[in-house]
Amino acid sequence: MKRTYQPSKLVRKRRHGFRARMATKNGRKIIAARRAHGRKRLSA
């Protein structure tokens, strides 16, 4: 059986990266929430 996590830097950036988050309203909400929480890393 193939494992579920098959790492790929490109897919990671495209799906969870900063620009992907900023592209949608809810994504911007996530970034804002992580900023308010004082996260060191905002996105992948």
Swiss-Prot record:
NCBIfam families: rpmH_bact
InterPro entries xrefs: Ribosomal_bL34, Ribosomal_bL34_CS
Single GO BP term: translation
GO molecular function, one term: structural constituent of ribosome
Residues in coiled coil: none
PANTHER family the UniProt entry points to: LARGE RIBOSOMAL SUBUNIT PROTEIN BL34M (PTHR14503:SF4), MITOCHONDRIAL RIBOSOMAL PROTEIN 34 FAMILY MEMBER (PTHR14503)
Record protein name field: Large ribosomal subunit protein bL34
Keywords for the protein's UniProt record, in alphabetical order: Ribonucleoprotein, Ribosomal protein
One Pfam family from the record: Ribosomal_L34
Region forming the signal peptide: none
GO cellular component: ribonucleoprotein complex; ribosome
Family: Belongs to the bacterial ribosomal protein bL34 family.
